[in-house]
Amino acid sequence: MLGGGQLGRMFTVAARTLGYRVMVLEPDQHSPAAQLADEHIIAPYDDAAALTLFGTACDVVTTEFENIPAATLDFLAQFCPVRPSAHAVKMAQDRLVEKEFVRSCGLSPVPFAAIRQPQDIAAAQGSVAYPAILKTARFGYDGKGQVTVKSAAEAEAAFAELGEVDCVLEQRVDLQREISVILARSTNGEACCFPVAENEHRNGILHQTIVPARIETQLAEAAQAAATRMAEQLAFVGVMAVEFFVTKQGELLVNEMAPRTHNSGHYTLDACLTSQFEQQVRMVCGLPFGDTRLLSPVVMVNLLGDVWHDAQPDWLALLQSANTKLHLYGKREARVGRKMGHYCTLAPELDAALEEAGHIFQKLQ
């Protein structure tokens, strides 16, 4: 496993449950995944000696976040299979490249314009209406590297604030829902989707995921078909996520993709027969798909460092709920906006799960 965050941690649990040994390469000696892995190489992702040791020791390599250098994945591919490939990961590292890829799949991205120099902002006014969001093309996640702008003048100021690096200017769309599809694709090209998730964000960070998504079946099937098409075009192997916007006119727009397991798929740990992490193990190791059926309506709520205040939260209010599962990631320091854990609340009816999950979150506040 390249990367030692919480996604790698939950992958490690799934892999060891299936009898595999896991080696993590991650610079942070206290990372969540390294705490549970069989072996941990503490090194940067571009350390050739460490990568050689890692590649020769492993039967297959996978990743838990998309900002691993593509050159690192290409280097490791000389020793063992790398799943997903450098090509697939590289596609998700640049928002401009990703949006052109979405178009090449015959799908619709959010209206956008490439901003590489200040004069591009004026030129974009014919294709992007304000308000809009200016995002760095690379290295942005969880609301980082993006600024909401209401005019060309604000966009110019934001572009300067972001260092005049390559950016994407995205039109703000009138949303009905935000949804995501977690998809697994095997070495023989077969694909399998998890139930579509509905996502609610706060300050650019996922707050809660609601499953099943409160959308029409036809729209859910269209989202799964779109995600499958993208995976096929990438010759993807592993687990990936595609986020969509559903407009108030019922249009489906691709927001972004992640070539890995995803925060909005954490509900699968408790509400599906097979979790997204076990499915990742199965895909990279050449095993059959696990069953992705939803066993119960579920609401997943993220726990950010915000709820820690000056001490560990009192988990009693949460653990008193017999149908709620707590997952903590083993991070040493709680910070505002940092994902420290999550919980899943299950109920026979979705409304009941929503009510109880919300009640628990209020108590933790």
Per-range role (PLM):
Residues 192, 240, 252-256:
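Protein kinase-like catalytic core scaffold
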